[in-house]
């Protein structure tokens, strides 16, 4: 069998500093292939690897990167003490500016946000780029973690009807943040919401997932389920972006 050439591979890096990176790797592996959406469809194999340093990222040269859940402050500390001399977060800021896709889940969504409510004293290093207000540990402590079904309206391009509705998607919230507000309402698209019933019986709608250009954020953990549809969505976005760059 003829070996796949570079153009027939889509490479996904999963930041493996701390948290649930192995689950993300396994979920991406379960997808196996994706296809271009042009008239003559091309089949793309998916390569996924853990990345722990800037040198790892440069070596893999991924088309997209996933930031896992975990403890955002711990990840920021590990990133700042990276032993190859380059801060991963600084590198990822430039990676995003170059138009590459990135997806943060739970703690990863905090790291991608420009504004964090409830940030620890002295703050923490953030990657930023996502123009929202996010609240750390909005859903409470570990014992307040829960699972529920939500609907997601997954957008592929801005001002375009091309979207996929995922109904009854299993969402796992573990000491989860919540997106309280969208600052840049023109460019940030809401793809998931949830109605929270507070202890006093009142209800509040919070945002659970958003897309801003090449940045995706979800406050829940798709990687802890048996449903790889959100990962399929991200991989397809990465592929579409890659095809635009190489103009297939």
Swiss-Prot record:
One GO MF term attached to the UniProt entry: glutaminase activity
Pathway as given in its UniProt record: Cofactor biosynthesis; pyridoxal 5'-phosphate biosynthesis
Keyword flag Hydrolase: yes
Record InterPro entries: Class_I_gatase-like, PdxT/SNO, PdxT/SNO_CS
Pfam families: SNO
Catalytic activity: aldehydo-D-ribose 5-phosphate + D-glyceraldehyde 3-phosphate + L-glutamine = pyridoxal 5'-phosphate + L-glutamate + phosphate + 3 H2O + H(+); L-glutamine + H2O = L-glutamate + NH4(+)
EC number(s) from the headed UniProt entry: 4.3.3.6, 3.5.1.2
GO cellular component, one term: cytosol
Residue sites binding L-glutamine per the record: 70-72, 136, 174-175
Alphabetical UniProt keywords: Glutamine amidotransferase, Hydrolase, Lyase, Pyridoxal phosphate
SUPFAM superfamilies on file: Class I glutamine amidotransferase-like
Active site: 106, 221, 223
Biological process (GO), any one: pyridoxal phosphate biosynthetic process
Statement: the UniProt record of this protein carries the keyword Signal: no
Primary role: Catalyzes the hydrolysis of glutamine to glutamate and ammonia as part of the biosynthesis of pyridoxal 5'-phosphate. The resulting ammonia molecule is channeled to the active site of pdx1.
Protein name per Swiss-Prot or TrEMBL: Probable pyridoxal 5'-phosphate synthase subunit pdx2
Organism: Dictyostelium discoideum (Social amoeba)
Lineage of origin: Eukaryota, Amoebozoa, Evosea, Eumycetozoa, Dictyostelia
């Amino acid at each position: 069998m003829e070996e796949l050439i570079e153009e027939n591979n889509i490479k996904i890096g999963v930041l493996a500093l701390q948290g649930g990176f192995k689950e993300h790797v396994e979920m991406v592996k379960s997808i196996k292939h994706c296809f271009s959406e042009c008239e003559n469809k091309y089949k793309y194999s998916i390569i996924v690897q853990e990345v722990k340093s800037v040198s790892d990222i440069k070596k893999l040269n991924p088309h997209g990167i996933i930031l896992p859940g975990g403890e955002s402050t711990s990840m920021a500390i590990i990133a700042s003490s990276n032993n190859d001399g380059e801060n991963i977060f600084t590198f990822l800021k430039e990676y995003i500016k170059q138009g590459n896709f990135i997806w943060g889940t739970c703690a990863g969504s905090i790291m991608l946000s420009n504004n964090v409510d409830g940030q620890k004293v002295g703050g923490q290093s953030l990657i930023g780029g996502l123009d929202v207000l996010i609240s750390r540990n909005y859903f409470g402590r570990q014992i307040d973690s829960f699972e529920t079904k939500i609907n997601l309206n997954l957008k592929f391009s801005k001002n375009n009807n091309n979207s996929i509705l995922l109904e009854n998607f299993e969402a796992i919230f573990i000491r989860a943040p919540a997106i309280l507000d969208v600052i840049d309402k023109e460019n940030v698209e809401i793809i998931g919401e949830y109605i929270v019933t507070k202890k006093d019986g009142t209800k509040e709608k919070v945002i659970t997932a958003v897309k801003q250009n090449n940045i995706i954020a979800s406050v829940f953990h798709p990687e802890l389920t048996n449903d790889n549809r959100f990962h399929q969505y991200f991989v397809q976005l990465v592929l579409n972006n890659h095809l635009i760059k190489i103009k297939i």
